[in-house]
UniProtKB/Swiss-Prot annotation:
Chain segments annotated as transmembrane: 9-29, 467-487
Known catalytic reactions: a ribonucleoside 5'-triphosphate + 2 H2O = a ribonucleoside 5'-phosphate + 2 phosphate + 2 H(+)
Disulfide bonds: C78-C102, C246-C292, C328-C334, C380-C403
Listed cofactors: Ca(2+); Mg(2+)
Active site: E168 (proton acceptor)
Top-rank EC class of the record's enzyme: hydrolase
Annotated EC: 3.6.1.5
Descriptive protein name: Ectonucleoside triphosphate diphosphohydrolase 8
Biological source species: Bos taurus (Bovine)
Length: 495
């Protein structure tokens, strides 16, 4: 006996449900691809504890990294209130307060869920190097106070560290070459590529207490103590680097004034680097607080009166006495003070006080060496009243020193480092590039990400839209056929 028409309907619906369900299953199995989900984002915080102030930088990078070094970008820059941490030597308990404002900004930027896994570092530079030389116990107290204050934050504080001058120079070199895409670039084909070594640029950094020069020389580095080697993005780099402690802008200009005091017989000092018409007073003792200063006179209780004479020629002669150029006579591989340096070559980026001074003097548009020299001399010859009247807002603190600073930079770069009219055009005076500040902190963060284990990117399953839509249709048909078969079974076949 054959099937009734109701049974045939029931059988057809079951068959349709089976075919549709099998088709949907095949689409799921065959049309699905294994894909990489967008990588998670990691964050890092670095405090730059300089001689005159402290800055905080927040960096971010994807958790899956290129050859074990994070692809890092700057997310926040903040200048802390107050002077540098070395200024709190007599009252270290207050140093933590000066850092809290910027730390709170950083914590607000970073998602709370990531606070506990965010590493935070503080690197101190020449200001603390000088304090450590002058009074190691006070320096240790300052570092201990910093560690206590930052250790209470919800992030992963890794400690406060005194950077060597060589580290400061090398990390600055890493920063600028990374920002310019000279260490690694993302190609149109979606791959990370490394440009040629010949395109790498040198770094010229000047803080308040020290100055650094770092570059890849044209030949071997003969003095291995001036060599730094590190690995980034799967490639090894070797650079010449040297840091001159006491040759930062603030310390150098303070030393010039101290030398003028020693050459004077009274308390009225005529300063050739200050504009004519300038007159100011300062405590004599303030010139001898730093280990960079010459021997102090027996009586430091008096005040000095300083008058400017606006004599750039005499100013240059006073500045040249700082360098001890005669110790390099007859040597092509010597900068000053007997320090080994290969001849400069290639392009350089000059930042920090190099940039601040030349930006004020409108010299960042790459004038010739003779043009820069003429501009600075013309500025030094201006009367103080004219300089004050034409100064932009917010420059009162540094205004008297721009003449001396400009001439000091020229003397350092030309007579010290050996730049000439021909190589001068290779210097770029910049403070930012690629959306990030130029300095040692980004290079420091890039180097430290080698210590953070690389994470495999998260994986998931994905389909093209067409396959997904077809699968949905067949799932709906399967459900409809199944429900139809159930209805036939319940309402028809039970009759």
């Amino acid at each position: 006996m054959g099937l009734t028409w109701k049974q045939r309907v029931f059988t057809a619906l079951l068959g349709a449900a089976a075919v549709s369900g099998l088709t949907a299953l095949l689409l799921v199995l065959v049309g699905t691809m294994n894909v990489l989900l967008p990588p998670d984002t990691k964050f890092g915080i670095v405090f730059d504890a300089g001689s005159s102030h402290t800055s905080l930088f927040v960096y971010q990078w994807p958790a899956n990294k290129e050859n074990d070094t994070g692809i890092v970008s700057q997310a926040l820059a903040c200048q802390a209130e107050g002077p540098g941490i070395s200024s709190y030597a007599s009252n270290p308990a207050r140093v933590g307060e000066s850092l809290q404002g910027c730390l709170e900004e950083a914590l607000a930027l970073i998602p709370k869920a990531k606070h506990h896994e965010t590493p935070m570092f503080l690197g101190a530079t020449a200001g603390m190097r000088l304090l450590s030389r002058k009074n190691r116990s006070q320096a240790e107290d300052v570092f201990a106070a910093v560690s206590r204050a930052l250790g209470q934050s919800p992030v992963d504080f890794r400690g406060a560290e005194l950077l060597t001058g060589q580290d400061e120079g090398a990390f600055g070199w890493i920063t600028i070459n990374y920002i310019l895409g000279l260490l690694v670039k993302y190609s149109f084909s979606g791959e990370w590529i490394r440009p040629l070594e010949e395109t790498l640029v040198g770094a010229l950094d000047m803080g308040g207490a020290s100055t650094q020069i770092t570059f890849v020389p044209g030949g071997p580095i003969l003095d291995k103590t001036a060599q730094a080697t590190f690995r980034l993005y799967g490639a090894d780099h070797t650079v010449y680097t040297h840091s001159y402690l006491c040759f930062g802008r603030d310390q150098a200009l303070s030393r010039v004034l101290a030398e003028l005091v020693q050459a004077s017989t009274g308390l009225l000092i005529r300063h050739p680097c200050y504009h004519s018409g300038y007159r100011g007073t300062l405590a004599l003792a303030s010139l001898y607080e730093s280990p960079c200063a010459p021997a102090a006179p027996p009586d430091l209780s008096q005040n000095l009166t300083v008058e400017g004479t606006g004599n750039p020629g005499a100013c240059v002669e006073a500045l040249r006495k700082l360098f001890n150029f005669s110790s390099c006579d007859g040597r092509e591989d010597c900068a000053f003070a007997g320090v080994y340096q290969p001849p400069v070559q290639g392009q350089f980026y000059a930042f920090s006080n190099f940039y601040y001074t030349f930006n004020f003097l409108n010299l960042t548009s790459k004038p010739s060496l003779s043009g820069a020299n003429a501009t600075i001399w013309e500025f030094c010859l201006r009367p103080w009243k004219l300089v004050e009247a034409s100064a932009p807002p917010g420059q009162d603190r540094w205004l008297r020193d721009y003449c001396a600073s400009g001439l000091y930079i020229l003397t350092l770069l030309v007579e010290g480092y050996g730049f000439s009219e021909e190589t001068w055009g290779g210097i770029e005076f910049r403070q930012q590039a690629g959306g990030a500040d130029i300095g040692w902190t980004l290079g420091y963060m890039l180097n430290l990400t080698n210590l953070i284990p690389a994470e495999a990117p998260a994986q998931g399953w994905a389909q093209s839209f067409g396959v997904w839509a077809a699968g949905v249709v067949f799932v709906v048909l399967t459900l409809a056929a199944t429900l139809g078969a159930v209805a036939v079974q319940v309402f028809w076949l039970q009759d």
